[in-house]
UniProtKB/Swiss-Prot annotation:
Keywords from the named record: Pyridoxal phosphate
SUPFAM superfamilies: PLP-binding barrel
Role summary: Pyridoxal 5'-phosphate (PLP)-binding protein, which is involved in PLP homeostasis.
N6-(pyridoxal phosphate)lysine sites (modified residues): 35
Domain of life per record: Bacteria
PANTHER family reported for this sequence: PROLINE SYNTHETASE CO-TRANSCRIBED BACTERIAL HOMOLOG PROTEIN (PTHR10146), PYRIDOXAL PHOSPHATE HOMEOSTASIS PROTEIN (PTHR10146:SF14)
Protein's UniProt name: Pyridoxal phosphate homeostasis protein
Amino acid sequence: MNIQHNLNLIQQKIETACKEENRNQNTVKLLAVSKTKPISAILSAYQAGQTAFGENYVQEGVEKIQYFESQGINLEWHFIGPLQSNKTRLVAEHFDWMQTLDRAKIADRLNEQRPTNKAPLNVLIQINISDEESKSGIQPEEMLTLAKHIENLPHLCLRGLMAIPAPTDNIAEQENAFRKMLELFEQLKQVLPNQQIDTLSMGMTDDMPSAIKCGSTMVRIGTAIFGARNYSTSQNK
């Protein structure tokens, strides 16, 4: 597994997708999804220039964060999995970003538990854009209520939205979901002009070009960088 080669391929695909939309490649950030991957794989990605990583499991993520901090390696860590209220403290204390915020209760706990010597925790509201019962996230019509709640929490910084649309090979269906997200993103920026709303996290290994076409500013890629995961699943590549 040549991680540097894989990262180069992904960056080329990002560049191609951006050129087709007359976008600067620098407007799309690559988040390497490193869940279930060993420290050695993350280190290889870091040595190839990758500095932002996404983890789905709290304890696994914290162990990796602590290892790299002990080595003096400064990485940016995003929590991208569903979060139970009894695990909020670890996310608040260790991660830089939390992308799956979908409840005021979780927001309150993260705000209370964020160390005061750290910068505010960057958060994204997760939208259940395909209305799937199996997926986390709030309904689109609930977005503004939660966003205004977060706005009043001093140790959180609302940066935008995140979504995991229902997997499909149909390009039109992909783009339909992503365009809905872009509309919500623009609405959020208009309603909260004083917040740093600049991040629309959508697009994974199989639908990245469609996501970039529809305005994504952050793509979450795991399989195409690190290879197949170490357990059997068909979703959330």
